[in-house]
């Protein structure tokens, strides 16, 4: 906490140099960059605490998001799913790659036996857990469960392999950590052109 306070103090004392220090600050404290950019956008819009004039910011329209469901016992997962449905979620996100893959597939099959794709959209997040030697086979197996998309199936900085995965179209791919750890816009645009993911 002291480190972020110290960095925030340094940024505030050097705010006139924001454009030249922003990238360096982002590498260590992306939350500070988010805060400063939000404050600057608010200032640009007259300081009315409304960054964008949209139906969402006016409170007239919601943003559909997914409900996160944690892997666990079948009864635990079913309870979570029922809670998410009762809260109005039609889309859930499940983290994969942390426990035995066969068990994960069994749990996803269990979910699908209770909720078809029309009742519940399933998105997966692998957090880079799959390896080059198993990613295609694992995604092929997961695709049987009518999966909407998978976030970051492999670890970052494997652009050629990630491009192959996206081109294979076993299921749609969304980037996650790949975007977080790529700081400058030029590299980010090059990466997006090289990989061509279905979602970012």
Give residue ranges: language-model regions.
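N-terminal capping/lid subdomain adjacent to the active-site entrance of alpha/beta enzymes
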Residues: 1-122, 127-129, 136, 140-144
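Catalytic core of soluble alpha/beta enzymes
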Residues: 99-200
